[in-house]
Amino acid sequence: MRNIASFFSSVFNPLLLPTYGVFLVLWVSILCYLPVGSRLTVLLVIFGITCILPMVLIALLHNMRIITDKQLRTRQERWIPYIFATLCYVGAAFYLIHVHSPLWLTAFMWGAIASIVVACVVNFFWKISAHATGIAGLVALLFSLHNMGLAAFDIMWLICLTIVLAGAVGSSRIALGHHTLGQVLAGYVNGVVCIYLAELLFS
């Protein structure tokens, strides 16, 4: 059981979720008709900015003994990586603007930035689940694509699958003892509200 929980926690690491989100947009929305090479280039750049760079920083902080745990399970050690991740996400948003991405794609990144800022602020007095925030953001993104008529095909099955995965990820965090039910639920709310509002405001 613990191995399954660890699997879900690793596969849906918060640093991977922006890449998953951009992948979904590029492959299930009307943008799927763009050349594959162009889509892969955007995806790889987003992966580098929002995943590789923060991972390198976390490794450096760990080697410098500024943080004691690469998994950032200690609340007090999360704020520096959160701030750096926010800067990386801002860079990713401006990259999407630079390549003339639709406003509703850039909105996803601004929503992700907002969710990190909320998590960072809350982190000073309570621990909120970043995993739950990220996976709930994907659910909100898919709902937005569906409601705005931007999906290239019927994605209700994908929305349902993502909701199930969100439940699995949240349950995994609780099973591993990293979060309470309240912290996971707060993460869900954070992800859904930030991404959905960003899509409404910027689209």
Regions found by a protein language model. Give the residues of each.
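The first (N-terminal) embedded transmembrane alpha-helix
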Residues: 9-29
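Cytosolic, membrane-interface loops and tails of multi-pass inner-membrane proteins
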Residues: 59-72
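Core segments of transmembrane alpha-helices
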Residues: 84-93, 134-139
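Membrane-embedded catalytic cores of phosphoryl/pyrophosphoryl-handling enzymes
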Residues: 99, 104-203
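Short, Lys/Arg-rich, polar N-terminal cytosolic tail immediately upstream
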Residues: 1-6
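Loop-to-helix transition at the N-terminal end of transmembrane alpha-helices
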Residues: 36-52, 75-76, 188
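Juxtamembrane helix-capping/reentrant segments at transmembrane boundaries
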Residues: 8, 69-84
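Membrane-interface helix termini and inter-helical loops of multi-pass transporters
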Residues: 29-38, 67-70, 98-102, 149-151, ...
